[in-house]
Amino acid sequence: MFINSINTPLTMVSLELLLAIVVPIVGLALAGYNASSVLRIQPEKKELTEINMLIAEGGKTFLMREYKTILPTGAALTILIWVAYYVIFHSGLMAGLAALSFALGAIGSAVAGYLGMYVTTRSAAKTAWMGRNGMGPALSTSFKAGTVMGLSLASIALLIITILYMAYSSVLPTPLWAEALAPVAFGASLISLFIRVAGGIYTKAADWGADIVGKVEAGIPEDDPRNPGVIADNVGD
């Protein structure tokens, strides 16, 4: 197997490892630049800012509540992974490193999720405001806001995996460091799954529970900001 053929000593940092460290740092810097350029835009229309801040605050509250719910589940799974690795490999070191991988994967995914949420929930009004100058500025604003999540997630994941690889390969033989590193993906998937599924359920409940009802019963157009359900719908989205 290819993975078994990798055996790079920690003292000999190859070009590939150097790139694996530099690239995510550049990615995070670019994400920070894009976020800054979007957040600097200040719409002069009061209604845009007010509605956007309601969505942003709702998104932050929802995400923090999600993280509080995920925390005990993540802690239980971390312990379960430790036990499973200890039983399989009969090694406290392997078990501890596997549990650490899972925890760091979850934390990295959670941080990327928060950064992406913070920027994107504040970008809607800014995109609408820049739309006064045409499609180009509006598309540029929304595109930059969207790249924050993607760049942050990929960069944080690559940085975590690279650092753990360098550390694990120095204390474990070639087949075992890969086994200890694998739970990083499980930890990252835990957070993304919770956010995706819970957010989808939340927005659908708001859509049917208030947005559609307001349209049918009160004659308020769908996605009209006068309906509070629209704010909740956008929070879930």
Labelled PLM ranges:
Residues 10-236:
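Hydrophobic, small-residue-rich transmembrane alpha-helices and their short perimembrane loops
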